UniProtKB/Swiss-Prot annotation:
<dbReference type="GO" id="GO:0008270">
    <property type="term" value="F:zinc ion binding"/>
</dbReference>
<keyword id="KW-0832">Ubl conjugation</keyword>
<dbReference type="Pfam" id="PF00096">
    <property type="entry name" value="zf-C2H2"/>
</dbReference>
<protein>
    <recommendedName>
        <fullName>Zinc finger protein Eos</fullName>
    </recommendedName>
</protein>
<dbReference type="InterPro" id="IPR050589">
    <property type="entry name" value="Ikaros_C2H2-ZF"/>
</dbReference>
<comment type="function">
    <text>DNA-binding protein that binds to the 5'GGGAATRCC-3' Ikaros-binding sequence. Interacts with SPI1 and MITF to repress transcription of the CTSK and ACP5 promoters via recruitment of corepressors SIN3A and CTBP2. May be involved in the development of central and peripheral nervous systems. Essential for the inhibitory function of regulatory T-cells (Treg). Mediates FOXP3-mediated gene silencing in regulatory T-cells (Treg) via recruitment of corepressor CTBP1.</text>
</comment>
<feature type="compositionally biased region" description="Basic and acidic residues">
    <location>
        <begin position="25"/>
        <end position="34"/>
    </location>
</feature>
<feature type="region of interest" description="Interaction with FOXP3">
    <location>
        <begin position="281"/>
        <end position="586"/>
    </location>
</feature>
<keyword id="KW-0805">Transcription regulation</keyword>
<dbReference type="GO" id="GO:0043565">
    <property type="term" value="F:sequence-specific DNA binding"/>
</dbReference>
<keyword id="KW-0804">Transcription</keyword>
<dbReference type="GO" id="GO:0045892">
    <property type="term" value="P:negative regulation of DNA-templated transcription"/>
</dbReference>
<feature type="cross-link" description="Glycyl lysine isopeptide (Lys-Gly) (interchain with G-Cter in SUMO2)">
    <location>
        <position position="501"/>
    </location>
</feature>
<keyword id="KW-1017">Isopeptide bond</keyword>
<comment type="subunit">
    <text>Self-associates. Interacts with other family members; IKZF1, IKZF2, IKZF3 and IKZF5. Interacts with CTBP2, SPI1 and MITF. Interacts with FOXP3 and CTBP1.</text>
</comment>
<dbReference type="GO" id="GO:0051260">
    <property type="term" value="P:protein homooligomerization"/>
</dbReference>
<keyword id="KW-0862">Zinc</keyword>
Length: 586
């Protein structure tokens, strides 16, 4: 190794700095000093080598500099300097041992450098002592790149964690990963004290305190804190639609869906549903002379077709309840068709009406004759009864009423509505308006089939749903006095087989113009009032007992216990349940 005999500059040193390609200023100054002719054969060797390791620290200024105080740790001898930071005593020279310049090849340099130092830079980056680097594990993006926390360099250039073996793409990723082992969270929120391992997470957290939502939708007022949330929101605007989030809309009913496939499935069902409504309406309007039945659930827009889209279709998209998407929306419209007395095929006022207005038991105190059944039920549980078809009986009280002293014959065959929409409770019955009930059919129909009579218990529900009638208005006011007899109509021959012997002498009366009648008489031969439950096929001579019994039948299902809700299969099971009194309420 060649060492220059003397240098025109004085070097003082106590520290050791390795500069494998940086500190360009010190290197240039050294080359400038050596280019004075002292060692002409040294510079080519210096230029060809990759690294210089100097034993002394180059000093440019006189006095105690900051670098000398920080790194040398000892006072430096006096020196004379000029304003251009060059020494004025070139006669002073250093001995051969005062400065030592060593040159190594690439292989020797890589052997001398530790594995941690080789991880930082591949190009000629600065490698300084640990005292010059920033604190480990903190990076705010403003200073130089932090020192790598350590790892194993793989042949593909990636770093491997020496704790768990996780492979990271670079030193920064490895540094953040090592914080999961050390538990270090250098980024802290000044407002709530939350700490984070990365600065980006802290910045996103600060937006929670400020309420800032920097990502805004250009099409609507939607704003969010994260970019990925905005990206998902923008997909809703891919197809222009007034319904945000559901861009696929049905042309028939206006309902919107998120996916095209779901819309296609719905349109097929919705179109078939509307076609069925149209077919039913055409069949109904084509037979104006038939009996008035099956008239409900027909919207006005179907009765009066027009070229425009029906107005009721807009209501299909505004369903009030949740339902499966596979079920087409149901029309929600007028539940009752109202008719005046002139539209009915028979005269309601022919033989009188009620003695007084129909009223609920809740309006009166319970009499002792009612027994324990109604007392157990309570007046709050009393509802309008679902009475049997009146083809078999012409006089039935349509609601649970108070004890009548006299019962009036009802010439029209009436029944309470089968749904709650028709009005129930005292507020619907006592407001002064006409009472609405459904008519079964024409009284004067001479061709009534015997099957329209008292049906068996197994087909009670289906027959009730099949026979849907219109709505009639009952007159109010005191009607004339009734005749002393009660006429019970019969149509079913099977009923006569079940009861071959009439109770207390059932005398066959003269058949009327359109049906056979039975008259109940007592032992002395005088007529006796009788009340019949069509569901259980039981005759009651006392109206109070009949009312109590009818109160046990359910509103929607006649074989559902109105006390506890128990469902029976037939009238025998229902009667057994009522007799045993096994009611489990709640």
């Amino acid at each position: 190794m060649h060492t220059p005999p003397a240098l025109p500059r004085r070097f003082q040193g106590g520290g050791r700095v390795r500069t494998p390609g940086s500190h360009r200023q010190g290197k240039d100054n050294l080359e400038r000093e050596l280019s004075g002719g002292c060692a002409p054969d040294f510079l080519p060797q210096a230029q060809d080598s990759n690294h210089f390791i100097m034993e002394s620290l180059f000093c440019e200024s006189s006095g105690d500099s900051s670098l000398e105080k920080e790194f040398l740790g000892a006072p430096v001898g006096p020196s004379v300097s000029t304003p251009n930071s060059q020494h004025s005593s070139p006669s002073r020279s250093l001995s051969a041992n005062s400065i030592k310049v060593e040159m190594y090849s690439d292989e020797e340099s890589s052997r001398l450098l530790g594995p941690d130092e080789r991880l930082l830079d591949k190009d000629d980056s600065v490698i300084v002592e640990d005292s010059l680097s920033e604190p480990l594990g903190y990076c705010d993006g403003s200073g130089p790149e932090p020192h790598s926390p350590g790892g194993i360099r793989l042949p593909n250039g990636k770093l491997k964690c020496d704790v768990c073996g996780m492979v990271c793409i670079g030193p920064n990723v490895l540094m953040v990963h090592k914080r999961s082992h050390t538990g270090e969270r250098p980024f802290h929120c000044n407002q709530c004290g939350a700490s984070f391992t990365q600065k980006g997470n802290l910045l996103r957290h600060i937006k929670l305190h400020s309420g800032e939502k920097p990502f805004k939708c250009p099409f609507c007022n939607y704003a969010c804190r994260r970019r990925d949330a905005l990206t998902g929101h923008l997909r809703t605007h891919s197809v222009s639609s007034p319904t945000v989030g559901k861009p696929y809309k049905c042309n028939y009913c206006g309902r919107s869906y998120k996916q095209q496939s779901t819309l296609e499935e719905h349109k097929e069902r919705c179109h078939n549903y509307l076609q069925s409504l149209s077919t039913d309406a055409q069949a109904l309007t084509g037979q104006p002379g038939d009996e008035i039945r099956d008239l409900e659930m027909v919207p006005d827009s179907m009765l009066h077709p027009s070229t425009e889209r029906p107005t009721f279709i807009d209501r299909l998209a505004n369903s009030l309840t949740k339902r499966k998407r596979s079920t087409p929306q149901k029309f929600v419209g007028e539940k009752q068709m109202r008719f005046s007395l002139s539209d009915l095929p028979y005269d309601v006022n022919a033989s009188g009406g009620y003695e007084k207005d129909v009223e609920l038991v809740a309006h009166h105190g319970l009499e002792p004759g009612f027994g324990g059944s109604l007392a157990f039920v309570g007046t709050e549980h009393l509802r309008p009864l679902r009475l049997p078809p009146t083809n078999c009986i012409s006089e039935l009280t349509p609601v649970i009423s108070s004890v009548y002293t006299q019962m009036q014959p009802i010439p029209s065959r009436l029944e309470l509505p089968g749904s709650r929409e028709a009005g129930e409770g005292p507020e619907d019955l006592g407001d002064g308006g006409p009472l609405l009930y459904r008519a079964r059919g024409s009284l004067t129909d001479p061709g009534a089939s015997p099957s329209n009579g008292c049906q068996d218990s197994t087909d009670t529900e289906s027959n009730h749903e099949d026979r849907i009638g219109g709505v009639v208005s009952l007159p109010q006011g005191p009607p004339p006095q009734p005749p002393p007899t009660i006429v019970v109509g019969r149509h079913s021959p099977a009923y006569a087989k079940e009861d071959p012997k009439p109770q207390e002498g059932l005398l066959r009366g003269t058949p009327g113009p359109s049906k056979e009648v039975l008259r109940v008489v007592g032992e002395s031969g005088e007529p006796v009032k009788a009340f019949k439950c069509e569901h259980c096929r039981i005759l009651f001579l006392d109206h109070v007992m009949f009312t109590i019994h009818m109160g046990c039948h359910g509103f929607r299902d006649p074989f559902e216990c109105n006390i506890c809700g128990y469902h029976s299969q037939d009238r025998y099971e229902f009667s057994s349940h009522i007799v045993r009194g096994e009611h489990k309420v709640g």
